[in-house]
A protein has these predicted regions:
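Glycine-rich phosphate/pyrophosphate-handling loop used in enzymes and phosphotransfer proteins
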Residues: 1-296
Length: 296
């Protein structure tokens, strides 16, 4: 008996059938993967029920929801516009944030992205009068760009992803259809790292080198900042970022998105270069803000 007699005709399988087969295979593989490597709570490591669901156990999820129950405006330590966050960087929040950033728990992105989306919603509501100002919006009326904070090439290589980019995408997805504006995340393959020489001598875009990681990129050799003081962070960030495609943001309304706001040095530099490129920065949104004398 040949394959056609058994009811299988490879030449006649429709795209719809192939799609259903692929979906079934993906679900089957996901189920097998979960059987071999059961899911656990990202915060307390307790085993989670089989099947899809939050990346936190019921108790930790309740604590997370309490921590992010109400958005708030914070006073940044740098010259940045209005900043809206969903929580303070304490309690359960650091464990969730670091789980997503450093432990590969990208299954936490939906929870964090939802928190970020609520911040974006509040900021947009506060600036809703700007959407009717054609002189500001021009040809791109009723569209707001979510600009994720950049990750260094070394951190992207280590993690395999850029945290703020994942969160901005998730926030945009959750807000789709709920707002009078369409939100989109700027493509992430058009800006690289500014060379040290271009920072020192004001080099042109042609001097830019390094890995393409997002609309904005940190200067090469930037390294980690978390051990630096607020003043040191500000000095280190000045001139570190470049918008390499100014035409993509000129005359556009932008919101800067990040996972955690510490001193505001990164946000301040993003505001500077985006404004120089001609964009209108409405503000900064983040999942959490770090209290003074604390560091993520």
């Amino acid at each position: 008996m040949n394959v056609q007699q058994r009811g299988v005709s490879f030449g006649r399988v429709s795209g719809r059938k192939l799609g259903r087969s692929a979906d079934w295979a993906a679900r089957a593989w996901g189920s097998l993967d979960e059987l071999l490597l059961p899911r656990s709570c990202s915060c307390c490591s307790v085993a989670l029920p089989y099947g899809s669901g939050p990346a936190l156990c019921a108790e930790c999820l309740m604590r997370w929801k309490r921590a992010c129950a109400k958005t708030e405006r914070v006073d940044p330590m740098q010259d940045v516009p209005e900043t809206v966050v969903a929580s303070r960087y304490d309690g359960i929040v650091p464990r969730v944030v670091l789980g997503m950033k450093n432990a590969g728990r990208t299954d936490l992105v939906p929870l964090m992205g939802d928190a970020l989306a609520r911040c974006v919603f509040e900021l947009l509501r506060a600036h809703r009068e700007d959407f009717g100002r054609s002189s500001v919006l021009g040809a791109t009326e009723r569209e707001v760009l979510l600009i994720p904070a950049p990750s260094s090439s070394s951190s992207v290589s280590r993690r395999g992803y850029a945290p703020a980019t994942l969160l901005a995408r998730e926030a945009a997805r959750r807000l789709k259809g709920r707002l009078p504006t369409s939100l989109r995340v700027m493509p992430l393959d058009i800006v690289g790292y500014a060379s040290a020489s271009s920072r020192n001598d004001g080099g042109s875009i042609g001097d830019v080198a390094g890995t393409l990681t997002g609309l904005l990129g940190g200067a090469s050799g930037g390294g980690e900042q978390k051990t630096l003081s607020a003043v040191a962070r500000s000095e280190r960030m000045h001139g570190a970022l470049r918008v390499l495609e100014p035409a993509l943001v000129a005359g556009r309304l932008c919101i800067i998105c990040d996972d955690v706001v510490t001193t505001g040095a990164t946000a301040a530099e993003m505001v500077r270069v985006l404004r120089e490129a001609g964009s209108v920065v409405l503000g900064v949104c983040a999942v959490a803000s770090v209290p003074k004398k604390a560091s993520p």
